[in-house]
Amino acid sequence: MSHATKEFLTALEETCARRRDEILGSADEITIIGQTYYVSNDGDDGNDGLSPERPWRTLRRVSEAPLSEGDGVRFRRGDLFRGGVDTKPGVTYAAYGEGDKPKFYGWDKNLADPSLWELWDKEHRIWHLTEPILDCGTLVFEGGQAHSRKLIPSYRDGGFVCRDDEGRPFHPSAEMTRDLDMVCIIDGRLTSHPSKGENFPIPIMDGESLGDLYLRCDRGNPGEVFGDIEALPRRRIFAVGGNNNVTVDNLCIKYTGEHAIAGGGGCLRGLRVTNCEIGWIGGAIQHYFGTDPNYPEGGRGTVTRYGNGVEIYGGCDGYTVENCYVYQVYDAAMTHQINTCGGFFGLRNIRYRRNLVEYCVYSIEYFLDKTQGDTRSFMENCEISGNILRFSGYGWGQQRHNTHTPAHIKGWSFENTARNFRIRGNLFDRAAYRMIHLVAREEESCPVMEDNVYVQRLGLPLGQYGANAEAEPPILVFDEGAEETLRAIVGEINPTVYGVE
């Protein structure tokens, strides 16, 4: 093991800054073989969109357009678009022009407007947003200089109650104890669909569930205190669904409480995400069913939060995330995952390459949870290579009950049947908990590790690796013997290890 000197850490910061600048400055080199359509802030949806001089204006026009496979939509650099895009099969979404990557933000407007806020509780300095809003993962102030702590009350007996004491009604005035605390109260639509053996009414959470947002702001009206307030609403920005062969290239996708780019189904083919900036993602409430596997003690009425940068939930064949800068994500920067529930899913030909990931709870996540008798599902030909993965568990997503889950590579401890799975040439730079969590039922399903660099604080966990058919592998410690541990237990070929005092 080498010790990470001040000079080493300074050089590491410089390397990451160069990588970040390279990604943010990526040229528009992607080729569109079909018809190209253009979109800009000063366009008109009545235009045909067929040239930069006759662009469309809105994302709704893009979503509703009858695009064909091979077509592409280019958004003007320097422009800001709000809302989401319903993608079409075989279509490329990219940039044109000069300047910064075109920006896609989740909510309809910036909230730094004094007229959007009214004083709700003078004594406790709590402000109410005057317009209805979707559930939000958090609020981000001044481009990331500060963010809110989201409170997540449970719902029982027709009202909100405190998560840690369900016998105590939730009152914002009593529970919002810190500056910039926020809570969303959304219970206009209820469902009795059963969960956890119960069927009492709980709030419906979907794209139509609007309600009230409350924010504690000790310095006054938030719209006067801050010049920039972005909400992370429960909304996907690029909804891929089951559309095959979608490409998203050279876009900046930020501020959404669900997923930046989301696909899934039986077998999603050919999703490519390249040269993108993705930040401040996730944290919205998925549901109140109480089925969060990381909070098994929670009953019906407790929340599950979620939100990933790029996600495939289901089978896939040909899935690439490459040369992207992803940061401040509530869950994973990028992930492929499925609970099979007795079905058959193949997750094939997956590539996560040359990305820079910072301040996410999971830099890269995968899992294959084979349940209800499934014995056939598998992962095959997975490559995680050339990535710089930094500060797992040190971002805003740690405002969660399960603070022991962060990892740079998070495979959890499921069956995770896999073949030809390689993790090589990556830099793992500090994690609040495990650096790696690579467990499968059988040892041969664990990834081959080669030429990876590990930088971690001495005494913190290195992680877990190995088979769990008989027992869960132990959590390994990152200590002076970490290099030997990596060679002997993880089977890492040619590791490079730096300890941080």
Identify what each model region corresponds to.
Residues 1-5, 9, 357, 475, ...:
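Intrinsic-disorder-associated interaction segments
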Residues 244-255, 268-301, 306-311, 316-337, ...:
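Right-handed parallel beta-helix
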Residues 40-47, 70, 99, 112, ...:
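Intrinsic-disorder/low-complexity regions
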Residues 81-94, 99, 354-356, 373-500:
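Predominantly extracellular beta-rich ligand-binding scaffolds that present long acidic/polar faces
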Residues 111-126, 196-202, 231-238, 256-265, ...:
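Extracellular beta-strand/beta-solenoid scaffold signature
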